[in-house]
Amino acid sequence: MEYESRSGLVALLHRLGLEYRKPEVIPRHLDETKQRAFIKLYEKLMNALGADEAVLFVDAVHPTHGARAAGCWAAKNEHLAIEQTTGRQRLNIHGAIDLETGRTKMIEAEAIDAASTIKLLAGIEALYSTTALIHVFLDNARYHHAKIVRKWLSQPGRRIALHFVPSYCPHLNPIERLWALMHQHLTHNKTYPTCREFADAILNFLRDEVPRKWGEFCDSVTDNFRVVLPANFRILA
């Protein structure tokens, strides 16, 4: 059976109950027990959260100053292009977000390491100066477990408690969704003449626009956690 038109083939696929889908990228090593335990712990903490406590999610992101093409709608016979940049410098941003308010703390660093972790945590404490206890959820990167970070946290008067997301589970850290939102708004099909302009746009979005427009963005950056299991997918490759 041959179909001479794309529309005819698409119609056949729909009649066969098929849809055009983009596969999810899932980690190779997923522990169901650890995922369920984390979600249970998180829900318990949130249900008992005091009025003088806050919850933030921390992660690092490394946007690259370069053209990032993405699919979009256009006239049928129109050829689209975006200009390539002259370099591929990379930003190093260590950041945190409060899902309740949309408040963020973002630092630009030479490198993401134990020093940037301490700088970020200190900035969070300063931002939440009247909050008795600040719960910070973050991944298991080695620098988050560094000896100098633990030493800093043990100092008298510190108000931060760290909670680690299970390994290989970026879907359990909502700030990952913020990074996706950032790319959607700032890097897809956009180009910036200089790296400084690129950095300014990224940092302005994360520091100012996200909190200011949180009512618009909050449904895209949520703690609607789910357990991800390879058995629930047909693995293509």
Predicted regions and their residues:
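Conserved short alpha-helical interface segments
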Residues: 1-30, 54, 61-63
